[in-house]
Amino acid sequence: MKKKAYVGLTTIIMGLYFLAGFSFAAGNEAEELKIINKIITLSTNQGAQPTTLESRPGTTVIWVNQSRDPVEILFLDKKVTLACGSPVNFFIGKDGAYESAKIPFGGTASLCFTETGKFDYVFKASATYYPLREQEHRGIIWIK
């Protein structure tokens, strides 16, 4: 009789232990990841629009070239060395930081930012028709 009571009590204690464990695990759900895309248009006449963009880590910035000429994007002071996802029209340069390939008219480039900070960039239009007319415009991306 004592043995049955001991087995019964052990079963109840183990059942309560597992129930407590499952209710604790249910309360620790993973935080929902929200995908954020921000678009910057590039124009040799108007520069980058918006000129300053603010967002948070995990944001994918998409640049759209609305210039007639191909453009390149280069980061100045703080370089982007780590990105989430698969960057489009970006490659890792000699210094280990991302820089863009030439983006044709109507083309896009995108980069997902994982690090916080202020990222100053310049985009250069390579004048195909008028080589002496090469232009530069600046923009800022704040990841907070």
Where are these regions (language model features)?
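Short aromatic-acidic-glycine turn motif
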Residues: 79-89
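Short, Lys/Arg- and Gly-enriched loop/turn segments at beta-strand edges
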Residues: 69-77
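Sec-dependent signal peptide cleavage junction
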Residues: 20-29
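Bacterial N-terminal signal peptides that target proteins for export
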Residues: 1-9
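Extracellular/periplasmic metallocenter environments
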Residues: 26, 95-144
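Asparagine-centered strand-capping/turn motif at beta-strand->loop junctions
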Residues: 63-67
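Bacterial N-terminal signal peptides
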Residues: 10-20
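N-terminal edge beta-strand
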Residues: 28-61
